[in-house]
Amino acid sequence: MLALLKQFSEKRFVWFLLAFSSLALESTALYFQYGMGLQPCVLCVYERLAMIGLFVAGIIALLQPLAFILRLIALALGLFSSIKGLLISFRHLDLQMNPAPWKQCEFIPNFPETLPFHQWFPFIFNPTGSCNESQWSLFGLTMVQWLVVIFSLYVVILTLLLIAQVIKTRKQRRLFN
């Protein structure tokens, strides 16, 4: 199975799927903000940045999927982004499920001074909403719960792909070849 996953990771389609799915989710977030009028909070902005990290990881490996080092860089960036996104989503879910006056998120994103994304790209990274509000749901799950599911899937898939890259597998012996 690991050999199959390694072969699978050497195909451009896999990395295109990663880049396309994260771009589609980012586009959906922008539609929710500008099309439906839902206001993003600080944690939503951080989750968006994690999604953009997944997009960049997909683009890196899409350049040359047969290059081992590019695959490893893409997997490391993708796994870091998906784990970070999952942790932020868990924190966001805790704020929504267990609201309390002392549990609030900040109003201004805490980006490094050298990378003030909220000033460079305010149409994507400028938070205007509250983290405690649940504004949308689908099939009984809120947007944050969907993000927990999505980031969990990314973590599992990228972890399996990373394991397939580093663990040596025995070649299959064929009897009739």
Swiss-Prot record:
GO molecular function: electron transfer activity; protein-disulfide reductase activity
Top-level taxon of the source organism: Bacteria
Topological domain ranges for the Periplasmic compartment: 32-49, 91-145
Annotated Gene3D superfamilies: DsbB-like
Disulfide bonds: C41-C44, C105-C131
Membrane topology: Multi-pass membrane protein
InterPro entries: DiS_bond_form_DsbB/BdbC (IPR003752), Disulphide_bond_form_DsbB (IPR022920), DsbB (IPR050183), DsbB-like_sf (IPR023380)
UniProt GO cellular component terms: plasma membrane
Keywords assigned: Cell inner membrane, Cell membrane, Chaperone, Disulfide bond, Electron transport, Membrane, Oxidoreductase, Redox-active center, Transmembrane, Transmembrane helix, Transport
Subcellular localization: Cell inner membrane
Transmembrane segments: 15-31, 50-65, 73-90, 146-164
Residues exposed to the Cytoplasmic side: 1-14, 66-72, 165-177
Major subcellular location class: membrane
SUPFAM superfamilies the record matches: DsbB-like
Family per similarity comment: Belongs to the DsbB family.
Job description of the protein: Required for disulfide bond formation in some periplasmic proteins. Acts by oxidizing the DsbA protein.
Protein name: Disulfide bond formation protein B
This protein's encoding gene: dsbB
